[in-house]
């Protein structure tokens, strides 16, 4: 099932169902994509306005980056669902013999690593979305500054939620050093971009 081909209602019905995917990871990617789309909205409302002629080239460049970023996050909605399937399959492998147990452990470890990789990609993309939102808030139409603030908040929430999906998988890993490295990367992204998102929100809300 191609999740991005579903209607909004169809996606939400799948999300609300007992199906294992989509779940928090896919929803995070979708929320991030919505945040980036809000940034693009600011750009669309700015381009062509005489008042913003001095920054038009900058806004056009932002719009190109934002469109590519939104497409990346849309693809990650599907990628997250597909990354979960091997984890679920690994748990169903037999473990009657030592050989089966070793095989199951190896397959599960590999699947968990991939299940961490996708939400880390979502986090990275959302960080880029927050940076874009900051530029849209600074240079875009004042009539749409609240949308730039919403863009930053959406991407922040999506990043934090994706971070939870990293942790839920690293906690199951046998290779604790690798798990710690993945968690450290997630924490680094949060430390870098959450304050930036908060600054965008404050600058918009205090106007």
Question: What are the residue ranges of the model-derived segments?
Answer:
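Short, hydrophobic/aliphatic alpha-helical segments
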Residues: 3-22
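Amphipathic, well-ordered alpha-helical segments in soluble domains
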Residues: 7, 11, 34-41, 83, ...
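Conserved phosphate/anionic-ligand binding catalytic regions in large, soluble enzymes, centered on
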Residues: 17-40, 144-162
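Amphipathic alpha-helix face/heptad-repeat signature
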Residues: 30-34, 62, 69-76, 115-125, ...
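Transmembrane signal-anchor/signal-peptide helices with a preference for the extracytoplasmic
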Residues: 41-53
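A structural-propensity feature for long, helix-poor, extended segments
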Residues: 50-89, 189
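Amphipathic alpha-helical interface segments
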Residues: 80, 84-153, 157
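Preference for long, well-ordered alpha-helical segments
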Residues: 129-132, 144-203, 207
């Amino acid at each position: 099932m191609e999740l991005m081909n579903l209607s909004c209602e169809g996606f939400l019905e799948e999300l609300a169902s007992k199906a294992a995917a989509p779940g928090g990871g896919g929803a995070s990617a979708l929320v991030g994509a919505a945040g980036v789309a809000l940034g693009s909205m600011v750009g669309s409302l700015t381009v062509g306005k005489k008042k913003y002629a001095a920054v038009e080239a900058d806004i056009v460049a932002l719009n190109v980056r934002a469109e590519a970023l939104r497409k990346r996050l849309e693809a990650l909605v599907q990628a997250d669902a597909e990354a979960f399937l091997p984890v679920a399959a690994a748990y169903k492998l037999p473990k009657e013999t030592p050989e089966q147990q070793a095989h199951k452990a190896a397959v599960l470890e590999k699947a968990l690593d991939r299940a961490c990789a996708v939400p880390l990609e979502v986090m990275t993309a959302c960080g880029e979305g927050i940076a874009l939102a900051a530029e849209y808030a600074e240079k875009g139409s004042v009539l749409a500054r609240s949308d730039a603030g919403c863009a930053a908040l959406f991407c922040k929430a999506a990043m934090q939620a994706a971070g939870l999906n990293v942790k839920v998988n690293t906690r199951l890993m046998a290779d604790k050093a690798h798990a710690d490295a993945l968690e450290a990367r997630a924490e680094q992204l949060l430390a870098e971009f959450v304050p930036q998102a908060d600054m965008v929100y404050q600058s918009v809300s205090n106007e």
